[in-house]
Amino acid sequence: MTAELATPRLLPRRFGLNKPKLEVHEGDLARADLILSRATYCDPQSNAALLGDKRLLFSPSGRSFLSYAPKGRTWLAFGAPVGQAEEAIGLAQRFITIARKLGAKPAFYGVGPSFEGIAEALDLQKVKTGERAILDLTTFSLDGKQRQVIRTHRNRHVKNQFSVRIEGPGAVRANLARLQTISDQWLVHQAGGEKGFGLGRFDVHYIDRLPLATVRAADGHIAAFACLWPSADKSRIGVDLMRYGEDAPNGVMDYLFAELFLWAKAQGYQAFDLNTSPLAGVEPCSSSPFVTNLAKLMYEHGEKLYNFQGVRRFKNKFHPEWEDVYLAAPKGVSHFVALARATLLINRPL
């Protein structure tokens, strides 16, 4: 049996989107969702495959997959393969082989420490493209001076009879109109509009596959929400879409995250992944000086595309550890071209 390649087809406009887009067949998304629920090898970011804006390459066993998007002659995988650890290297190699046979340039975007073994085995060259914020839940508490601001916001919201409700996949549709309103209000004040590829967007077919956390007033009115990226082995849980409405009280996101951290710890998760700050912490390096200089420049001056520095400031208030995130590619593949095309995929979702 050979690895299966699931390719997108053109679908009509759907709720939460501004235009038609290429999307993977629903059956393939269901397969990917099942693999995610059983995976022994995955990061929370692997859930971005459910966006439907990437192609899926399945392993011969059907127990693993890799998601990627073509842009020009570049094929960009988002993150590492997902599924069974023993299949990861073989599936990554299969992706490279298929891309080369079709005249494309393969690369892996947004990979972290879990990708080290694959990069070494396949002799891939890496360049840093950002940092990921990780909060250790095994030692987390709201005690101490470091957590004073977050603790104050939490206590005030509890006093004012707010609560956080965390529900499994399928909870979105019952509150769709309100969640859409919150999303629309939030987007008015954000640089660059909706994203894609490795960053979630408000698409009911995507967010309804994820656990949903909502902040509610005493009368049930929703003030804010966040979509969660779980991992089957409970090593980490992450957050993707997080938005609040115009009538949300000050500090509502601090309150939401405080409750999420406490809930995730009680559920047995080891760490909370606050997701990647693109281009953060990138310094010039001798192996790819042009790429790293460009990344640093974009981080410092690219606020119209993405609120790079604002995102990092928000995450820093929780005092996470920062781990490096890379773009990895075989020799002969331009990191500059791959990074430029990844930026286009993120900022111009299909």
Q: What positions do the PLM features span?
A:
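N-terminal alpha-helical membrane-insertion module
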Residues: M1-A6
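Glycine-rich phosphate-binding "P-loop"
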Residues: L76-E86
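A charged helix-plus-loop insertion that forms the helical arch/lid used to bind
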Residues: K126-R132
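A conserved beta-strand-loop-helix scaffold within acyl/acetyltransferase catalytic domains
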Residues: G16-L76, A104, Y109-K126, T138-H153, ...
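Short beta-alpha connecting loops at secondary-structure transitions
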Residues: K296-E300
